[in-house]
């Protein structure tokens, strides 16, 4: 089974670009509005340890390292290490008074148990991610109001 995953999600948010960018840049606050983000602990000025659990009975343990933080271009990108290896990024664009936030992620699973899982569970892992992203969008919308 391949252990590589690529995700692309688009959120439409009724909030100005600056507020959305500030909320997404503040990883330490994710667990206040994103239910699946269970814990966030800052390691230093560039890194945070994040524990994530969606529907499946497994908690991902990740270290996110800031790679790009460019508000003028609306880009946030982190390198991902731990149970997943790769990167995640937000690309924001203003649409009038609203903001579009595109989340992109390319990761490899590093957890031996998940690496050995049959390809039949790939749809479950994708569904788990989709649920987490829908919940995050709802949480951020509420947080921004």
Put a short name on every predicted segment.
Residues 1-45:
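Hydrophobic ligand-binding cavity/cleft-lining segments
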Residues 9, 37, 62-68, 87-94, ...:
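Hydrophobic/aromatic beta-strand elements that line small-molecule binding cavities or substrate pockets
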Residues 31-32, 41-87, 100, 135-145:
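Glycine-rich portal/gate segments that line the openings of hydrophobic small-molecule binding cavities
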Residues 15-17, 70, 95-97:
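Short loop segments at secondary-structure junctions
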Residues 80-135:
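Beta-strand/loop substructures that line and gate deep hydrophobic ligand-binding cavities in soluble
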